[in-house]
């Protein structure tokens, strides 16, 4: 049986933006992935004290954003899970759902890579997947040796990218909408229309 190489891109996607799509495309092409699965979070444990948009809206925006790319798909497994969202649990679920020989490539930013040794079941995460870490503009390159000291085995699991450097964030999109500014250059057109039609991120 031939192994399937599957990229995993998780996030609140509140909203999904062009930077997410650029990252997914870049990693797919560079590593020769067969597909990329987008996984909107339920209630992330690290954002337990923050209000995020309803899961249905975030899921719908992801579906709209990737509708023209057959090698992208979305799964709602974290949204359906009750309680806090943990990456290790999601990776274990994927191992049971996806074909047996599937290789998982988990995408994250350099900032999240720095925090990874403190994540829930971090050692299990690096056992279940390859890590693919990409920068944002202005971020300092992580000290991989130091991270490996904190989480032995991380370096062996890691693919450290120097690009794409993405300078877009969901918080920037939300802020611009709240201030009545356009976001068509930051999100796909269908997502911009959805935000407007559903009055997301507007001042209450």
UniProtKB/Swiss-Prot annotation:
Tell me a Gene Ontology molecular-function term this record carries: nicotinate-nucleotide adenylyltransferase activity
Q: Catalysed reaction(s)?
A: nicotinate beta-D-ribonucleotide + ATP + H(+) = deamido-NAD(+) + diphosphate
InterPro entries, per this entry?
Cyt_trans-like, NadD/NMNAT, Rossmann-like_a/b/a_fold
Q: What is its EC number?
A: 2.7.7.18
Entry keyword set: ATP-binding, NAD, Nucleotide-binding, Nucleotidyltransferase, Pyridine nucleotide biosynthesis, Transferase
Q: Which GO terms describe its biological process?
A: NAD biosynthetic process
Q: In which pathway does it act?
A: Cofactor biosynthesis; NAD(+) biosynthesis; deamido-NAD(+) from nicotinate D-ribonucleotide: step 1/1
Keyword Iron-sulfur present in the record's keywords: the answer is no
Q: Which domain of life is it from?
A: Bacteria
Report the function annotation for this chain.
Answer: Catalyzes the reversible adenylation of nicotinate mononucleotide (NaMN) to nicotinic acid adenine dinucleotide (NaAD).
The record's NCBIfam families line, in alphabetical order, gives: cyt_tran_rel, nicotinate (nicotinamide) nucleotide adenylyltransferase, PRK00071.1-3
Q: Which family does it belong to?
A: Belongs to the NadD family.
By what name is this protein known?
Probable nicotinate-nucleotide adenylyltransferase
Organism for this UniProt entry: Dehalococcoides mccartyi (strain CBDB1)
Its gene? Answer: nadD
